[in-house]
Amino acid sequence: MLALLLLAGRVPAATLVIHVQGADGRVLPGAVVTARPLEGGAHRPAPQHAVMDQVDRAFVPDLLVLPVGSAIEFPNSDAVSHQIYSFSPAKRFQLPLYRGKPYPPVLFEQAGVVTLGCNIHDEMLAYVVVTEAPYFGRTDAAGTYTGEVVRGRYRVAIWHPRLREEAADLERELTVGETDRAELTLRLSRPLLPAPLGNRPHSWDY
């Protein structure tokens, strides 16, 4: 279970602030936050065009959060060849051995978490979180996500590559109501999974 603190809000446009903490109470940077309206009328986020490069045998950036329908270019800036793949249900694809930028952008049409790897370099790891939520982002170094939302009821969810909980345990509802700011603090009930031994640093390290 997640402990939560809610201070609700009043105008049609309001500031939503989400604080995410680990089970030990420390702030959790790099977590993905999504806020989905529970009532109709919300806008659907426009697809984006993103780039995930390969530099020094690592994905750069190593985690992207994008709306459904977005496309990602996967250039290879290394002097060695890479072979990117994903077996995730939300997007299965493979880009055979290449350097430079020989392939067109990959389209991500389905919501879900897509795990990326390289068939040549096992240490390479990245994630793409594809969402239908109109409001999304990642927590900063202080474990906080801040966004502007319209007044209403929302389901807020968090995701992190090392979470143990099931998805249902990581969602909470809140109302942005009568003030111009709403805050929610989410604290994990269990420690994160340990980082893989010998793995290189990532943007979601804790």
Model-derived features: positions:
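Bacterial N-terminal signal peptides
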Residues: 1-8
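Extracytoplasmic copper-binding redox domains, predominantly the cupredoxin/blue-copper superfamily
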Residues: 13-142, 146-206
